[in-house]
């Protein structure tokens, strides 16, 4: 969602407008669109994660998933993370992206996990609920209760409804 970061750190040259237009083109067709996002990149701030959320709010997709960055060995970003002291060169990145392995001072693991957990809520629910979604990011009793309530709202309002397919099964 942050063009400058994507261009310099991820070496992606597509503009935000090109991404939005491509997603809208797919949405206008009969092709289902699943958007896979990543948060928790090295030096990424909460504001930059929200640039990605804002980008996702500008087009329709059948699903908006979110993973947490992992510095896989042999990649440019792995070398960058080791050089910055965010990750030990002998450590292996996890295959599952439930937590950030990076040791960064500007953002906590819990904050990255919270944004990733609530990503779909942030992309679909109205902005006037963002303060409640932020509560749902927390892994305490209040946060868990808020998350359950917001997920009920999300599922009843935005989640695709189950429909029968040709084979007689159910697809969601």
Per-region residue spans from a language model:
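Conserved non-cysteine loop/helix-boundary elements of the Radical SAM core domain that shape
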Residues: 1-62, 79-83
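Residue-level signal for pocket-adjacent positions within structured domains
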Residues: 4-5, 64, 72, 97, ...
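Short glycine/proline- and charge-enriched loop/turn segments
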Residues: 4-5, 83-90, 95
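Bilobed periplasmic-binding protein-like "clamshell/Venus-flytrap" ligand-binding domains
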Residues: 33, 63-67, 124-130
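Short, solvent-exposed turn/loop segments enriched in Gly/Ser/Thr/Pro and often Arg
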Residues: 39-43, 67-76
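Phosphate/oxyanion-binding loops and surfaces in catalytic or ligand/nucleic-acid-binding neighborhoods
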Residues: 59-62, 71-75, 80-88, 122
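Radical SAM enzyme core and accessory elements
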Residues: 76, 89-172
């Amino acid at each position: 969602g942050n063009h400058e970061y994507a261009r310099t750190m991820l070496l992606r040259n597509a503009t935000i407008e090109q991404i939005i237009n491509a997603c809208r083109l797919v949405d206008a067709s009969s092709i289902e669109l699943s958007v896979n996002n990543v948060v928790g990149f090295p030096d990424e701030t909460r504001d930059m994660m929200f640039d990605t959320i804002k980008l996702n709010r500008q087009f329709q997709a059948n699903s908006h998933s979110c993973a947490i960055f992992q510095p896989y060995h042999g990649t440019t970003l792995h070398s960058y993370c080791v050089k910055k002291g965010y990750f030990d060169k002998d450590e292996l990145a996890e295959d599952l992206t439930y937590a950030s392995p990076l040791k960064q001072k500007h953002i906590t693991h819990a904050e990255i996990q919270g944004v990733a957990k609530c990503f779909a809520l942030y992309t679909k629910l109205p902005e006037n609920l963002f303060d409640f979604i932020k509560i749902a990011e927390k892994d305490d009793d209040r946060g868990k209760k808020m998350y359950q309530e917001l997920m009920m709202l999300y599922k009843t309002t935005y989640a695709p409804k189950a429909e029968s397919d040709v084979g007689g099964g159910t697809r969601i």
